[in-house]
Amino acid sequence: MSNLIEVVDLCKTYGAGDTRVDVLRGVNLAVAEGETIALVGASGAGKSTLLHLMGTLDRPSSGSVLFGGEDVFRKSDMDLAAFRNRSIGFVFQFHHLLPEFTAEENVMMPALIGGMKRSAALGPARELLSEVGLAHRLTHKPGELSGGEQQRVAIARALVLSPRLLLADEPTGNLDMKTSDEVHETLSEINRKRGLTLVVVTHNERLASRMGRTVRLVDGRIEV
């Protein structure tokens, strides 16, 4: 199985001199197409920083991220933003849904930003909401949904442009155990159905156990 994403000698430093903080220190990681990985470790170990760099939300201090063999950080900021919107889906601890829009409108948003017409985006949005068990909530606004439903809308939104990679940063951190399990099952089912590559930062051992591989970070390095 070929690698979808490769992290090569990745370093990330903030500040300088006495305020310098080395968050990532030469991280190497290969993720195969369709693989599921849990990134675990203590707070401050660099998990979210690594996820953000894999998702091109930030640029590294040194090292590279190869996506399908291409060094993505050779792209301009504009090209990188277009690549990110097209190729990578994100789910965060807080759903970041737009409160004035319905579930289906929130799911359509990345497609509309990418230039797709509303008429073309509506069908995929409804199909995804059905896939995550929310066919009966299409026209409900975020304030009318439970926490688990809001997070499932966020998952559907992350998938609307059919990305090859889904990155999730503590996706169940704000949810109770029962609701967390429902979201875990949604993520697992999406991987099974779509063959989507999934990398999850989590402190939740139950979620980590559902992933095909667990990678532990300690002080900015991958524990071997």
From Swiss-Prot:
ATP binds at residues 41-48. Keywords: ATP-binding, Cell inner membrane, Cell membrane, Membrane, Nucleotide-binding, Translocase, Transport. It is an enzyme of class 7 (translocase). One of its GO terms (molecular function) is ATP binding. Residues 5-224 form the ABC transporter domain. GO terms for biological process: lipoprotein localization to outer membrane; protein localization to outer membrane; transmembrane transport. SUPFAM superfamilies: P-loop containing nucleoside triphosphate hydrolases. The keyword Transport applies. PANTHER family: IMPORT ATP-BINDING PROTEIN (PTHR24220), LIPOPROTEIN-RELEASING SYSTEM ATP-BINDING PROTEIN LOLD (PTHR24220:SF689). Part of the ABC transporter complex LolCDE involved in the translocation of mature outer membrane-directed lipoproteins, from the inner membrane to the periplasmic chaperone, LolA. Responsible for the formation of the LolA-lipoprotein complex in an ATP-dependent manner. This is Lipoprotein-releasing system ATP-binding protein LolD. It comes from Geobacter sulfurreducens (strain ATCC 51573 / DSM 12127 / PCA).
